[in-house]
């Protein structure tokens, strides 16, 4: 969370609350990452997500984002839907990003991994701003479980197919 103000100005604060995404990795029984476009058996074209009655096919964003030429503290987070990308050189599929300022109350996202395999995500985000103080309560669960840190990625859901 970034805040900006003039020390003399008590009541005028600007808060920039970054967005967030749900991250997914699907491994086969041999441990191959099926979210990797370079994996011969990847399932990127088979998966989809349904949110608010809209079904999203996986967009290919792998390797297209580069660090901006100029540093900024602004967090622009347009909603992209379902996409494959990489985090610290590990391919994954993300859903979102959800706007950090928006309140979500157990919103449901159904992830379809193909072959009749579905998982249900629940997304919550509550932001309370009181002057210069910001309180954020955020949760993304899948089938009732919290995400884990593994394979070099933070907050990711790992499935075996």
Where are the language model's segments positioned?
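Bacterial Sec-dependent N-terminal signal peptides
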Residues: 2-23, 157
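Short, solvent-exposed beta-strand/turn "edge" segments of beta-rich domains on protein surfaces
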Residues: 11-17, 34-38, 98-100
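Short amphipathic, basic-aromatic surface patches that mediate peripheral association
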Residues: 26-40
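Tryptophan-paired
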Residues: 42-115
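Glycine-rich, aromatic-bearing surface loops/beta-hairpins
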Residues: 108-161
């Amino acid at each position: 969370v970034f805040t900006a103000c003039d020390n003399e100005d008590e009541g005028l604060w600007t808060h920039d609350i970054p967005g967030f995404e749900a991250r997914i990795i699907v491994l086969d029984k041999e441990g191959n990452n099926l979210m990797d476009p370079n994996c011969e058996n990847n399932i990127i074209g088979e998966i989809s997500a349904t949110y608010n009655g809209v079904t999203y096919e996986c967009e290919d964003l792998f390797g297209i984002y580069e660090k901006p030429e100029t540093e900024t503290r602004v967090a622009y987070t347009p909603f992209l839907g379902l996409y494959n990308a990489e985090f610290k050189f590990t391919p994954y599929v993300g859903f979102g990003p959800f706007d950090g300022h928006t309140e979500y109350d157990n919103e449901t996202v159904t992830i379809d991994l193909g072959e009749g395999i579905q998982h249900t995500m629940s997304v919550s985000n509550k932001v309370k701003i009181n002057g210069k103080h910001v309180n954020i309560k955020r949760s993304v669960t899948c089938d009732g479980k919290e995400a884990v840190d593994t394979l070099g990625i933070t907050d990711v859901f790992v499935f075996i197919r």
